[in-house]
């Protein structure tokens, strides 16, 4: 009996020592990450500002940044979304940022803010918007992003006459491939994997070279590598949501694939997913396109500005969009497969359902 108690005591001590060592290791790894990635972290007016390492921030101090931020007004607004308002922050003639202000309203909103930081902190990819830092206070939170000079894909395709511009086919293809690569990186290469949950043309921003950058992780859900879904509140935008959202309330990577398929249709048709003409008829872009396909009148789908573009490239992209828009999620490709198929278009290979 005494021998058994001794063994149990020994095992308990070993378990406690193991747990403590894991905690210490986690703290050390976090401090190492922080030393490597954080330029400064300091209090300011009851809040805290954290900036990550970046060449563009070498000479910028938190005092200058926050003084400029506190002067933002409605005239600086460049966009708004479900999680907050976006402002243009001009530091000087050559340095500017996009600042998203998130109002602190509920505990859920705070959790969303922390989730966004966790998702964005270490992500570095040419097709994903860069998070430079954040400011957290009892009253509001600020996310500080790189500013994209060409705005959003939505503005180019559907903006007012002074904003919208004609995009040629090579540019549309480049945007589609870049956005696909960014989403695929979130799905397959980030640990934990990330489901965006709000893929749409207004969340695809364009840099000075018209390269796509996937933005707005305020609605991002982190997915453990061994999980296939996350059961949380449904977030997204009408016209882009996969049909299974309304049945199950589950966010999945295949839901993002569906939303990306809608973006491909926008690029091909030039139409908004919830165009007024569709709403008047009680339908939407996806339903309209599928109806036209069933009637074998695909030529009526394309944006008129694409009439002289390479037919094979257009048709292959259209086929990829339809694969992404399969009603059954299991029949949709993964984003990695979508990237591969889009890359095949320029190589001259025929796109087939994988």
Show where each model-derived region lies:
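Membrane-proximal cytoplasmic juxtamembrane segment of single-pass receptors
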Residues: 3-129, 134-144, 149-181, 226-230, ...
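C-terminal lobe substrate-recognition/regulatory segment of protein kinase catalytic domains
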Residues: 73, 289-330
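Protein kinase catalytic-loop region centered on the HRD/HxD motif
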Residues: 181-194
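Activation segment
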Residues: 247-253
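Conserved catalytic-loop aspartate of Hanks-type protein kinases
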Residues: 256
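Regulatory extensions flanking the kinase catalytic core
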Residues: 330-354
């Amino acid at each position: 009996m005494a021998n058994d108690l001794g063994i149990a005591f020994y095992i308990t001590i070993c378990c406690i020592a193991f747990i403590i060592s894991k905690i210490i290791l986690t703290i050390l790894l976090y401090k190492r990450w922080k030393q490597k990635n954080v330029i400064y972290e300091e209090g300011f007016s009851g809040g805290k500002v954290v900036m990550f390492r970046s060449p563009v921030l070498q000479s910028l101090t938190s005092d200058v940044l926050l003084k400029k931020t506190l002067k933002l007004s409605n005239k600086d607004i460049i966009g708004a979304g479900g999680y907050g308002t976006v402002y243009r922050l001009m530091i000087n003639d050559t340095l500017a940022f996009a600042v998203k202000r998130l109002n602190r309203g509920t505990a859920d909103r705070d959790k969303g803010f922390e989730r966004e930081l966790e998702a964005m902190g270490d992500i570095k990819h040419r097709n994903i918007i860069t998070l430079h830092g954040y400011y957290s206070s009892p009253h509001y939170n600020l996310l500080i992003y790189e500013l994209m000079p060409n705005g959003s894909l939505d503005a180019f395709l559907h903006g007012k006459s002074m904003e919208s511009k004609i995009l040629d086919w090579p540019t549309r293809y480049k945007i589609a491939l870049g956005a696909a690569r960014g989403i695929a990186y979130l799905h397959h290469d980030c640990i934990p994997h990330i489901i965006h949950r709000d893929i749409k043309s207004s969340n695809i921003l364009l840099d000075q070279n018209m390269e796509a950058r996937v933005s707005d992780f305020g609605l991002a859900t982190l997915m453990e590598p061994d999980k296939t879904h996350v059961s949380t509140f449904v977030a997204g935008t009408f016209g882009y949501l996969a049909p299974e959202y309304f049945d199950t309330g589950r966010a999945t990577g295949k839901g993002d694939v569906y939303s990306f398929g809608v973006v491909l249709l926008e690029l091909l048709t030039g139409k908004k997913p919830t165009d007024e003409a569709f709403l008047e008829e009680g339908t939407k872009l996806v339903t309209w396109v599928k109806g036209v396909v069933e009637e074998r009148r695909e030529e009526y789908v394309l944006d008129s500005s694409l009439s002289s573009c390479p037919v094979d490239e257009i048709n292959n992209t259209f086929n990829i969009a339809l694969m992404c828009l399969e009603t059954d999620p299991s029949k949709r490709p993964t984003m990695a497969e979508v990237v591969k198929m889009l890359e095949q278009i320029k190589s001259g290979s025929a796109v087939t359902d994988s």
